[in-house]
Amino acid sequence: MLRNEKQKLRVLFCHSIRLHYLCNMINYDLKKIKAIVFDVDGVLSMQTVAMDAEGQPLRTVNIKDGYAIQLAQKLGLKIAIITGGHSDSIRKRYEYLGVEDVYMKAAVKTETYAELKKKYSLSDDEIMYMGDDIPDYQLMRLCGCPCCPKDACSDIK
């Protein structure tokens, strides 16, 4: 792994996220992280959703997030998506980026999270989760390193 690439990844993530208060960063070793799990709406896509002529939601994604995800994978991190929503275009986007674990319509995110941990034999301390709203709260309490976008709802910050 190239040192320069690790620095780029750190800058990309630290620029756009706020580490959650549940994660005591003073004593936390980010080197433990083996997987990063993301929510979609409000995290990897904008908080506003346009609708097409058939009433299907149209979401926009940030190209820099895609670059950061690919770089994280290149550095050996497992990337997963756990979202309560469903969008074929979002699924295709992250599959295109090489994300193998894209869980849509996750009614209870903590159950999907437990499946993911079991699949890869991960502990909570080895997982970073980024969420932005109340449905993410319980999962953020479980993972080793919860974080959120700067514009997350105040209850999550």
Regions found by a protein language model. Give the residues of each.
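Surface-exposed amphipathic alpha-helices with a cationic face
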Residues: 69-74, 114-121, 141
